Structure formats: C-alpha cells, structure tokens
Amino acid sequence: KNKKNAEQLSKNTKEAYPSKDIQIQNDDCNTKLIELSKFLLSPEGRNLKVLAYIDPYGMQLEWKSIVSLSRASIDIWILVPTGLGVNRLLKRNGEITETWLTRLEMFLGLDAETIKSFFYKIEKDLTLFGEEEHTTKEKDAIKLSANIYQERLKSVFSFVSHPYILKSTQGNIMYHMFMASNNKTAVKIANDIIKTYNE
C-alpha cells in the first residue's frame, strides 16, 4: 500500500541479492496473485518454480487467490493476521457487521454460517423467566483461526507447515505464518526452520 516502502524493499533486495530475479509488487495482491498463477500455468511459465512471500495488507487477501496459486508450481509463505485481523472482526456477542462478515467469508473462503459455527456457541441460562439463549465467542479464537486457516490450506495444497507464531512485544499473538506447497521436502525444511524460531 505504501509506494515508498515498496521502492525501498525493492532497492534493498536488489542490493542484497543482485543475481536473483526478485520482483516486488505494490498493487492489489489478489489481482497480482491470480495473474502470477495464470502465468505459471501458461506455456511460458510452466517450467518455472516460484517461491512467494505473501504479506497482505490487513485481511485484503481473498481465498480465491490462494486456490489459484495451488494449481501452479509454487511454494508460498503466507502471513495470516489471526490476532490483528480475524480475531478483531469476531465480536464477543457474535454481532458481526455485514461488511466484516463478508470480509471473513472472502478471507477464509467459508460461508457466514460455517464461520459462525466455528467461532461461536449458543449458551442457555436458566432465569426467573425461563431459559434464555445468548451467543458467546469461543475461547482462544486466535489459535482456532490459525487451525482453521491451516486446514483450509491443506484442502488445496498437498503439504502445509506448522505455524510460525509472531507476537507483539507484550506477548500477544499477532500473526501465524505458514508455508504451503505441493512439495513435501519444501514443507519439511520449513517445519525445521519454524521449530527453531518457535522455541
């Protein structure tokens, strides 16, 4: 989203890795990822092997973009905003605005009812006036959202790593990062790296 940051990143990577073909894209990630997928499936791109680092702005990444990549010869590292994104949209009482619910649907690739069934439960309390129902958010929704996203990745990629957990200086979980691939060895290496950094 920030042109200056993208230019600086491009400059830094070219200086650090002058022999590598590294491309920094500062555009709508969904458009670019679908274009990349189409190219990798084309005659010009089908013999290429790509490693993509996906660091979406907020929750702008759409599930359809991940599905498109799963068909190509690509390994992806994806930063999933479980604490800073998904969890913040999930209101404790289950009253999520239509806008936020639509964003969750597009991000997770799930319908509204499925999302609600994962993250909320109906509890009944006995009162003087009989039973009353109320909706409550599941405990540890951040971990739950990471598990759901990991399972979603497994539904389209053959292999998915354990998550690397990124926390704030206060120890709050902000992100879970996964590697997804159709290459078993790539994910085995990713898991070895993740294990080292999660300790």
Place the predicted regions along the sequence by residue.
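Class I S-adenosyl-L-methionine-dependent methyltransferase catalytic core
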Residues: 1-199
